[in-house]
Amino acid sequence: MRTRLPDLGAHQYLQTQGIPLSVIGIDIRTQSRDRNIAIAQKLGIEKSIEFRAEEISEITATQTDVAIALHACDTATDDAIAWAVQSDAKLLFIAPCCHHDLQSQLSDIPEPWTMVTKHGLMKERMSDLLTDALRAQILRLLGYRVDVIEFIGGEHTPRNLMIRGVKTGAKPDAQDVKRYNEMIAMWKVKPALAERLEKELVRSTTA
C-alpha cells in the first residue's frame, strides 16, 4: 500500500524506512515549485514527489494518509486543515503562521478580558491562542484526537506551535460541543475553519 502524503506548506524519512509513498507539495509561488522540482530531480526522487503552484483552497479533495501544513499564512492554514479533513487524512501536522482573520473580529471583547486586549501585543497573542484553540476543538468535534505542542525552539521561530491530529472517528462529546459553542458565542467570532467545514460540523454534531 502506498502512503499518500500531501505537504501543504511547501520524504526522505519514510523512504529510508522502505515505505512506498507519494508526496505532493503545494505552494502558491511558481518560483518555489520550479526550485523544488529541480531539487527533486537532482536527488533522483522526482518519481515519488510532485510540486504544484496552486491555492490550497482550489485543490480537489483526494484520499490522503498524512497532511502537513507549515506556516501557511492566516486562513491558508484553515484551507489546509479543511482540505485534509475532506480528504480523509488520518494524520495531521499543522504549524500555523499569522492569525489576522480572528484578530480582526475581536471588537466586542467580553469582560474582564479587556484587561488583556487593551494592549496591542497581548491582543495579538490572545487572538493567536484563540484561533488555534478553536481549530483544535473543531478537529475534536470531527473525530480527531488532538494535541498542541511546541515543535521547535523559540530561538528559531516564534511560530513554533503545532496542532497534531489523529483520526479516530470518535463521536464528539456533548461537553466538547457545548464548550465550542460557548467559546464562539462569548467572543462573537466566526472561525474560518468552521465556515469551510460547516457541513461536516453539522453532520458530526447533530448525528
Q: Where do the language-model regions lie?
A:
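Class I S-adenosyl-L-methionine
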Residues: I28-A207
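Short glycine-enriched loops at secondary-structure junctions
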Residues: M1-R4, C98-H100
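Conserved SAM-binding motif I beta-strand of class I
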Residues: I19-D27
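Conserved SAM-binding loop of SAM-dependent methyltransferases across substrates and taxa
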Residues: T3-I19
